[in-house]
């Protein structure tokens, strides 16, 4: 009878930084049933942007800050997120960031960055949900106001040549 070793990764969890629609607790519960909410966090040296596909992304930007939330996710959740974010079709890619908790602790976290970073203004249900989630989780009010600068009159379209972040 052969003995098998239990997998060390069986209970492994990944720290995930969400800055867009995945900040929403109900949405994450539906997308990733094993996800556990950790709390709010910030990532320095990155800026928020809405790309030409009308999706949120972040990109490296000296002196900028992105606020969001941290989750712990299982390997199965990460596979679901990879599918949701379009990793296989190159819409997004995984990226490691240094996330700072409100108490000052900094931890490495996985996030997703869109491959298309050409900016645009946006609107509609996706962006409304993103803003609502940002408010519900308690992101700083001045940051939420900055997020709102990505909204276009009437919903989709327009251009914003800058990047957001303090």
Indicate residue ranges for each PLM-predicted region.
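Glycine-aromatic micro-motifs
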Residues: 2-166
């Amino acid at each position: 009878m052969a003995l098998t070793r239990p997998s060390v990764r069986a209970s492994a969890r990944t720290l995930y930084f969400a800055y867009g629609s995945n900040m929403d607790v109900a949405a994450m519960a539906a997308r990733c049933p094993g996800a556990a909410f950790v709390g709010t966090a910030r990532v320095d040296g990155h800026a928020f942007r809405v790309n030409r596909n009308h999706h949120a992304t972040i990109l490296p930007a000296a002196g900028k800050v992105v606020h969001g939330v941290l989750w712990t996710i299982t390997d199965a959740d990460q596979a679901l997120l990879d599918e949701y974010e379009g990793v296989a079709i190159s819409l997004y890619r995984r990226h490691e960031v240094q996330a700072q908790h409100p108490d000052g602790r900094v931890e490495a976290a996985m996030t997703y960055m869109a491959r298309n970073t050409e900016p645009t203004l946006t609107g509609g249900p996706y962006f409304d949900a993103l803003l609502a989630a940002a408010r519900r989780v308690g992101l700083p009010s001045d940051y939420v106001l900055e997020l709102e600068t990505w909204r276009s009159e009437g919903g989709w379209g327009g251009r914003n040549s800058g990047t957001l972040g303090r």
